[in-house]
Amino acid sequence: MKAMHTFENHTPMMKQYLKIKAENPDVLLFYRMGDFYELFYDDAKKAAELLDISLTKRGQSAGQPVPMAGVPYHAIEGYLAKLVQLGESVAICEQVGEPVIAKGPVERQVVRIVTPGTVSDEALLPEKQDNLIATIYQEKTQFGLAVLDMTSGCFQISELQDAASLQAELQRIQPVELLYSEALEDKHLIEQFKGLRRRPLWEFELSTAIQLLNRQFGTKDLRGFGVEKAVLGLCAAGCLLQYAKETQRTALPHIQSISLLQNSDTVQIDASTRRNLELTQNLAGGTENTLAAILDKCVTPMGSRLLKRWIHQPIRNIEKLQYRQQHIQMLLQQNLVEELQPLLRQVGDMERILARVALRSARPRDLTRLRTALEQIPFIQHQLTKIPHFVAFSQQIADFSVQLALLQRAIIDNPPLLIRDGGVIAEGYNEELDEWRSLSEGATRYLKDLEQRERANTGIDTLKIGFNAVHGYYIQISQGQAHKAPLHYVRRQTLKNVERYIIPELKTYEEKVLKAKGASLALEKQLYDEIFDQLLPHLGDLQLASLTLAELDVLTNLAERAETLNYVQPQFSTQVGLQIMQGRHPVVEQVLKEPFIANPVELNQKRHLLIITGPNMGGKSTYMRQTALITLMAYIGSFVPAESAVIGPIDRIFTRIGASDDLASGRSTFMVEMTEMANILHQATEQSLVLIDEIGRGTSTYDGLSLAWACAEQLAQKIRSLTLFATHYFELTGLPEKIEGIHNVHLDAFEHNDSIAFMHSVQEGAASKSYGLAVAALAGVPQNVIKSAKQKLKQLETLSQQNSYQSQSVLTQVQGELTLMEEEENTSAVIETLKTLDPNELSPKQALECLYQLKKMLN
């Protein structure tokens, strides 16, 4: 923007614009000018590029051309949607003064700020996906995180002990807008997100945050929410609430509580695992062939969003999980799915409609949809009374007969889009409104009578009475008969083929009608606002009802999925382990044209690591992923694709599957692989489910084998996690003989001549060969290359036999090297301890104790 020192040289209109822009420097300012929203200077250039609209000039101001871009006011929603998707924020500046009485530019002010994370307009929101805004506050190596869903009022905080935990949580919630303190040190953690907003440090002050939150909730302290000790989270929440109020320019009555999310409540899943398991997004970035695509047949958008929340945040509370299972079982036994789903479909997106009611931005059709939703509640409750388990469920939905009656009386069946268009409030709701309308609507009959009378009086058969916004009512006569116009006709407008006139009687009636229309619209707007006043005291009950109905939709949906897809109810055990009989991959079995080959998996304290061998394309990755997905499905309360399943306690799910480099960060495939493996080795426990696929590639054979061997040993002996370990290092199949708890399984295949058939069935024991050349032939590698490879393979096998001692002792060498490394580490530790000792300060007793300790370290 041009320098502000020329401010006094600008036109009055541009002075007004620059003043408002200075108050909103970090957002695009949509400045209302008649039927357009216009942008100037740098905003115009940016908007023209982002929206692909023309960049023009609006005359001059302060002696300089003014760059300008604009969009029609009636098309603004489409442009806002595009900007929001790009992570931009927009201030909407409207004319609030009356042009007739204004001296100079019409008074304007910013009425709302649309940001990606605080938007509530239906047209700007993804229907089946949460739209979250988050705030990060860092103190040393710890982080406070606050997350708000403006469209539901759900407000949560959490405290994270390290950067890895923060990254995992951000990947889970996928905020569309992210606020951060200007003092944030680890900015690389957030660089990949859109909608980044840097906030001043004072907005994160704890005392201010507590004061803001207590004022929002009408409380004296925050103890009732259980968040008072989460200091870092509260600092983030204070900044977030302040930002939400700043952008909405109104009260936020739908934000009625705040909760603390703790990692111990959920099964932890890191970003890599979410990606590898393709929970809601596939590896190509789409939504097809994901777990959510298979499980989500919910009939309401709010149900779909809740199900995705469950998928990304499996819970560890067995009581809650069994509660969900029991309700699914009851729905199936009572055959209520077909009864409930049509009723729930009519409920629609009640959750987001209520948010717009709270913000007083609900449109007329929102209120008709809310009315339809409330009409379904008695019928839904009637169905629920058939099942004793659902009595408590039904009791969470209050009696809304008064609010329903209000909406039935107040709003017509098919209202226009906007209240400003009028015709929204039903006839008979307000007597004064009916009177103004009758006067306004009686104009048609009066004007028709006047037109017939004037034709008779003048003898002009082409005489017509019309209206336009510029000249109001007029009498129109063709040019051929204009000479017959009486003397009291006052010419108002001359066109090519007609003359237009006004008479005192018509002018008087015009004023009367326009007054009636204006009064009617003003009163209708007032009555519309009063409907909000009557609904808002019941907002908490309405929100609870919408959440209950969303949960009912999810449970009904999971019941339908269980019946349609032949899922079974899993059992939970207090013993660590998994026992899945004939498990199936929930996504792959729906995509395959041929029958899916089901396979068992058994992991327990005596069998906690399976070495999986077999050919590429044999199904190793599918087998591992299906185990993780079945476990995850059990921990959201869903039935699972298996003949039976017993699931023990699980605290985390880890995967090291697939190969990809990270060019943006300059990390090779091997570096990415090792980083993920390091995370697993540091974080996994004996209650973790770990999937490892082909660790140790991307380096020399001995390096890779050594790493794979050491990782398997660590997982089996030290961590004792439940691990599926797929590998092409056949030397690792000797591990079960050396380490307790490791077992071999393999995916079967059958080779005949030059072809191979994959059996996809899991068998005990190690695979006999890798079938690599057969798979290469299937992939279309030219026959001459395959032939050459076979010859080379024979040479290598002959060479291997000649060096049989070396070949047979590879594993022994690896084990020896690792043992030597351990001894070196122990020796190093002893040396470091000796360096710190001062013999002159040790008593004889202390010296003897120290000697025993050093001896123990060496052993």
UniProtKB/Swiss-Prot annotation:
<dbReference type="InterPro" id="IPR007696">
    <property type="entry name" value="DNA_mismatch_repair_MutS_core"/>
</dbReference>
<feature type="binding site">
    <location>
        <begin position="614"/>
        <end position="621"/>
    </location>
    <ligand>
        <name>ATP</name>
    </ligand>
</feature>
<keyword id="KW-0547">Nucleotide-binding</keyword>
<dbReference type="InterPro" id="IPR007860">
    <property type="entry name" value="DNA_mmatch_repair_MutS_con_dom"/>
</dbReference>
<dbReference type="GO" id="GO:0140664">
    <property type="term" value="F:ATP-dependent DNA damage sensor activity"/>
</dbReference>
<dbReference type="InterPro" id="IPR036187">
    <property type="entry name" value="DNA_mismatch_repair_MutS_sf"/>
</dbReference>
<keyword id="KW-0238">DNA-binding</keyword>
<dbReference type="InterPro" id="IPR000432">
    <property type="entry name" value="DNA_mismatch_repair_MutS_C"/>
</dbReference>
<comment type="similarity">
    <text>Belongs to the DNA mismatch repair MutS family.</text>
</comment>
<dbReference type="Pfam" id="PF01624">
    <property type="entry name" value="MutS_I"/>
</dbReference>
<dbReference type="InterPro" id="IPR007695">
    <property type="entry name" value="DNA_mismatch_repair_MutS-lik_N"/>
</dbReference>
<keyword id="KW-0067">ATP-binding</keyword>
<dbReference type="InterPro" id="IPR016151">
    <property type="entry name" value="DNA_mismatch_repair_MutS_N"/>
</dbReference>
<dbReference type="GO" id="GO:0005829">
    <property type="term" value="C:cytosol"/>
</dbReference>
<dbReference type="InterPro" id="IPR027417">
    <property type="entry name" value="P-loop_NTPase"/>
</dbReference>
<dbReference type="Pfam" id="PF05190">
    <property type="entry name" value="MutS_IV"/>
</dbReference>
<dbReference type="InterPro" id="IPR007861">
    <property type="entry name" value="DNA_mismatch_repair_MutS_clamp"/>
</dbReference>
<dbReference type="Pfam" id="PF05192">
    <property type="entry name" value="MutS_III"/>
</dbReference>
<dbReference type="GO" id="GO:0006298">
    <property type="term" value="P:mismatch repair"/>
</dbReference>
<keyword id="KW-0234">DNA repair</keyword>
<dbReference type="InterPro" id="IPR036678">
    <property type="entry name" value="MutS_con_dom_sf"/>
</dbReference>
<dbReference type="Pfam" id="PF05188">
    <property type="entry name" value="MutS_II"/>
</dbReference>
<dbReference type="GO" id="GO:0003684">
    <property type="term" value="F:damaged DNA binding"/>
</dbReference>
<dbReference type="GO" id="GO:0030983">
    <property type="term" value="F:mismatched DNA binding"/>
</dbReference>
<keyword id="KW-0227">DNA damage</keyword>
<dbReference type="GO" id="GO:0005524">
    <property type="term" value="F:ATP binding"/>
</dbReference>
<dbReference type="InterPro" id="IPR045076">
    <property type="entry name" value="MutS"/>
</dbReference>
<dbReference type="InterPro" id="IPR005748">
    <property type="entry name" value="DNA_mismatch_repair_MutS"/>
</dbReference>
<protein>
    <recommendedName>
        <fullName>DNA mismatch repair protein MutS</fullName>
    </recommendedName>
</protein>
<dbReference type="InterPro" id="IPR017261">
    <property type="entry name" value="DNA_mismatch_repair_MutS/MSH"/>
</dbReference>
<comment type="function">
    <text>This protein is involved in the repair of mismatches in DNA. It is possible that it carries out the mismatch recognition step. This protein has a weak ATPase activity.</text>
</comment>
<dbReference type="Pfam" id="PF00488">
    <property type="entry name" value="MutS_V"/>
</dbReference>
